[in-house]
Amino acid sequence: MHHNDHSNGMPMSMVFDTSTEITLFFQGWTTTTAASYSLTLLFLFALAVFNRFLGVLKFQLDVKHTQPTEGRVPKLQQPRARRRHAIPKARLSPQPRYMQVAETDTEDEAPFSSAQFLESDAEHTRHEFPSDLIQEPQGPLGTRRWWNVYRRWSWRRDGTGSLLEGLRALVGYALMLAVMTFNVGVLCAVVGGIVVGELLLGRYAQPSLGWQDDACHH
């Protein structure tokens, strides 16, 4: 039996063309004029830039949540000029008198041994931190775990990351379907959006992760 490929509509083109009449995503989105075609290309360009923005946003959130929160360390400041001149100090000595070694101190003192302090520090570390967090090497290279948890699970943090990852996948697949129309203008709009997005937002992401880190997302 002979089956007509054109009975169910226009087949998808398998070669690149420069036509301004394309059907994008669904049947109602068909560009019939040059103005609608230009607006479609502008939308795809902005969508590619937005996809790069989502990748940078997720990276920034991951960096923010994985950085350890350290307490504020007070900065040491020099004393004021008036107080600086009031500190007693010998004329040829770079140190004030209260920092100099007293004359009654003997030079023939026993050498300082730090072994006992290192041992006590190690014991203190073992009691303070759980044993599963202290990785001691076993053998020349030591043992490594396959699954390492680097942060705690949180609805706010992990939920936001999951939504961003799902949105990136949705936008990435939409761009892929748009390029599969084999239209030269659509291809140039998507690639141009990727280039401009990397040019504007690439410095806010990790250098080793570009647009090619995940083919489905970009």
Swiss-Prot record:
It comes from the Eukaryota. One of its GO terms (molecular function) is copper ion transmembrane transporter activity. The chain crosses the membrane at residues 37-57, 176-196. InterPro entries: Cop_transporter. It is a multi-pass membrane protein. One of its GO terms (cellular component) is plasma membrane. Induction: Expressed in copper depleted conditions via the regulation of the macA transcription factor. It is found in: Membrane. PANTHER family: COPPER TRANSPORT PROTEIN CTR1 (PTHR12483:SF27), SOLUTE CARRIER FAMILY 31 COPPER TRANSPORTERS (PTHR12483). Putative copper transporter; part of the crm gene cluster that mediates the biosynthesis of a yet unidentified copper-responsive metabolite. Probably involved in the transport of copper, even if it does not act as a major copper transporter. In contrast to crmA, is not involved in the biosynthesis of fumivalines or fumicicolins. This is Putative copper transporter crmD. It comes from Aspergillus fumigatus (strain ATCC MYA-4609 / CBS 101355 / FGSC A1100 / Af293). The lineage of its organism: Eukaryota, Fungi, Dikarya, Ascomycota, Pezizomycotina.
